[in-house]
Amino acid sequence: DCYRCLIQWGINSAGNNGSEGESGWYAFPVNFNSACFALFCGLRNTDTNNPTKYDSEVQPRNWTTSKFNVYKQDYGGDPWFGSFIWFAIGR
């Protein structure tokens, strides 16, 4: 039951580098009162200053009612983690 659910979304920087690993924490614009039920993330773009590089993937890693972080996954080659979009549902 999602009566009075809170839906949030945004765009954040994934660090603008090719480093794989866990990111720092990102704050939700508004804290969820009791729980964040689900968090979805996807890469938005590559850096136009580095056109030979490509994005790999960001995965939701940990989240609380006030913040979250992601894991930047490199599948090989020459990655570049630019910005990513996120969507969260909670109460």
Segments and roles (model prediction):
Residues Y3-R91:
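Extracellular attachment/recognition segments
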